[in-house]
């Protein structure tokens, strides 16, 4: 899951790095320095941080959006790494760059950070200033910087959680059992069927997935296959969840006061006896 891109171009150094098939990027032999955080940006849950003051510790920077399901699904791992390794020197920083008008509102970002109980610092990058400095390509994106402030590794999309944690441990000089998979579909090496692509607005029609989500703003009810779901805050909301990847039909209708910006689908583990998905 997540974007697959032929290369990433760092605009500060013009260094091209090769994207691996897994979505991971190998750092090039020449050092790529961590871009600074523009000082005028608002940090929603801590006093402003400066990247140059993080030297001597590894820093994990994650681009995310509370209205994108792929971003939400990485949060348990980021929170766990913060709790596990902050005392050893790791700094986890969330860069919130909204894809929708509602997720570019700084107050909405702050409310989402509180609601999601995010324990690590988050900066609101609503004008894509940090995004552009990084030459970032999608959500979520995970940049690991070493103690010198040089790029150590980069991953686009979900997954590779164990690999990232082992890299963190290597930089810190510690060795522990990694955070276990937070969902069955996160099991290392598991091949997942392809899910239906994201659809604009309130989608009604056939789909194949393990779950269906909707990006919603406003307050009100959305009908999901005739079932009323009350929405009280903006974000990406889970509407349908299956124990395994399956085909289904979705009927959505947003009521007064509610706007549906996108319908999203996530993969599920194959059902017992189902043919194995082809390798990527």
Ranges and model annotations:
Residues 57, 114-118, 124-169:
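Thiol/disulfide oxidoreductase modules built on the thioredoxin-like
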Residues 66-67, 96-98, 153:
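The substrate-binding groove and active-site-proximal loops of carbohydrate-active enzymes
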Residues 2-3, 7, 42, 50, ...:
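Compact recognition or signaling/catalytic modules
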Residues 72-116, 124-132:
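Structural microenvironment flanking redox-active thiols in thiol-disulfide oxidoreductases
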Residues 48-72, 78, 92:
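Short active-site neighborhood of thiol/selenol oxidoreductases, capturing the structured segment around
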Residues 83-87, 114, 150, 169-176:
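Sec-exported extracytoplasmic/periplasmic mature domains
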Residues 35, 70, 76-80, 87, ...:
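Proline-centered helix-kink/hinge sites
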Residues 1-49, 54, 162-280:
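Non-globular targeting/processing and membrane-anchoring segments
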């Amino acid at each position: 899951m997540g974007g697959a891109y032929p290369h990433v171009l760092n605009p500060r150094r013009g260094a091209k790095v090769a994207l691996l098939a897994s979505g991971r990027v190998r750092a090039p032999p020449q050092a790529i320095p961590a871009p600074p955080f523009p000082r005028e940006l608002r940090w929603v849950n801590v006093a402003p941080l400066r990247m140059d003051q993080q030297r001597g510790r590894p820093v994990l920077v994650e681009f995310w959006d509370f209205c994108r399901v792929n971003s939400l699904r990485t949060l348990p791992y980021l929170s766990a790494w913060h709790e596990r390794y902050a005392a050893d020197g790791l700094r986890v920083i969330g860069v919130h760059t909204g894809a929708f008008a509602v997720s570019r509102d700084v107050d909405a970002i702050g409310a989402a950070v509180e609601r999601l109980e995010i324990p690590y610092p988050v900066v609101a990058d609503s004008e894509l200033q940090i995004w552009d400095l990084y030459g970032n390509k999608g959500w979520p994106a995970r940049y690991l910087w070493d103690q010198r402030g040089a790029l150590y590794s980069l991953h686009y999309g979900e997954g590779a959680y164990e690999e990232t944690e082992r890299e963190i441990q290597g930089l810190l000089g510690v060795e522990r059992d990694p955070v276990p998979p937070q969902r069955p579909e996160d099991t290392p090496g598991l091949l997942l069927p392809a899910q239906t692509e994201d659809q604009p607005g309130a989608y009604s029609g056939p789909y194949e997935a393990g779950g269906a989500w909707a990006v919603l703003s406003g307050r009100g009810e959305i009908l999901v296959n005739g079932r009323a779901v009350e929405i009280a805050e903006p974000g990406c909301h889970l509407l349908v969840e299956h124990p395994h990847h399956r085909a289904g039909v979705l009927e959505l209708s947003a009521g007064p006061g509610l706007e549906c910006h996108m319908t999203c689908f996530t993969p599920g583990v194959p059902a017992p006896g189902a043919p194995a998905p082809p390798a990527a």
